[in-house]
Structure formats: C-alpha cells, structure tokens
C-alpha cells in the first residue's frame, strides 16, 4: 500500500 502511492505520486 506504499508502492501504489509512490507510483501515483510519480505520475
């Protein structure tokens, strides 16, 4: 549930 947020913020 952290890498998902990381990918979302990377966008």
From Swiss-Prot:
Which UniProt keywords are given for this protein, alphabetically ordered?
ATP synthesis, CF(1), Chloroplast, Hydrogen ion transport, Ion transport, Membrane, Plastid, Thylakoid, Transport
Protein's membrane topology: Peripheral membrane protein
* Entry's localization field: Plastid, Chloroplast thylakoid membrane
Keyword RNA-binding recorded: no
Any one Gene Ontology biological process term? ATP biosynthetic process
Output a single Gene Ontology CC term carried by this record. Answer: proton-transporting ATP synthase complex
In its keyword annotation, does this UniProt entry include Protein biosynthesis? no
Q: Which family does it belong to?
A: Belongs to the ATPase epsilon chain family.
Q: What does this protein do?
A: Produces ATP from ADP in the presence of a proton gradient across the membrane.
Under the subunit heading, UniProt states: F-type ATPases have 2 components, CF(1) - the catalytic core - and CF(0) - the membrane proton channel. CF(1) has five subunits: alpha(3), beta(3), gamma(1), delta(1), epsilon(1). CF(0) has three main subunits: a, b and c.
Name the record gives this protein:
ATP synthase epsilon chain, chloroplastic
| Source species of the chain | Populus euphratica (Euphrates poplar)
Q: Corresponding gene?
A: atpE
């Amino acid at each position: 549930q952290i890498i998902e947020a990381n990918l979302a913020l990377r966008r």
